[in-house]
Amino acid sequence: MEDAEPNLDILSSAADALAGHYARGTYNELASLLPAVVQSAHQHVQALDGHERRRAHRLRADILVSAGRWLIQVREHDLALMALRDALTDALTADDPVFAAAVVPVQSWALLRQARFDEVEKLCERTADKVEPTKLSKATPDELGAWGHLLLWASAAAARNNRPEEAADYLRAAAAAAARLGRETEVTGRRPFGPLTVAMKEVENILISGRPDRALQLAEQLPQDVGLTYSLAVHRHRIDVAKSQVLLGDAEAATGTLAELRSTVPGWLRHQQSAREVAEDILAARTRMPSAEQRDLADFLGVPA
């Protein structure tokens, strides 16, 4: 891509390829493509002008978001924040405020990994106030998704900061946005948003509050037939289910839940610290020798058996 003439359609396809690898958890492939695609994006921005340059900025923002997400997964949080800062600048330069708003939750993810809970809540609340639709009934799906995801991350930060009432308030507002969509919809930022996304965040918040029994009850009552069966959000939710299971003393069920994820998204699961913590809990909960499956799972996740 480095020596080719500018071609925004090819660059767009490359951005799609990066996002696809991220969504499938094929991180080695993403990492091998990323340097050339980022370099090509820089060259496109430098070589083009006018409308085409704005489009190049928008595509580079998309590419940098994929880079930022991958860097978070491999725990390079400072580098991720640098990439996401540049993505936000590109989105604003491209005059795409909805995409700019969609970058903020990804920034928030990196900040949460650094336990910067107050900062995340304030950032998301402030940005949500700026992009809140005047009337939900007239908002586009992308506008609802951008606003809703900001509220979900504000809720996540509040829940982790021992502010359950505020977390619930943010979640209720996000649920109102999701209700307008009625079903899961892919929105700007290559993420789904809808009733299931909000319901899974509620399970996460309840688990964080120390109520694994209630978390499992809610997990069994998730909205059905709303258009989303496979996404990283669903996989992340299944780790919450496994965590709830082991906390309630059902190490066998938790093992089965993680084993299903290993079968479905092994590359993604291997990078999940939360999955490693569940595996540690499974081993600690055993009153006898761990099973072969549990030892194998622990080895896969890098947990001493």
PLM features: residue spans?
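Conserved binding/catalytic microenvironments
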Residues: 2-305
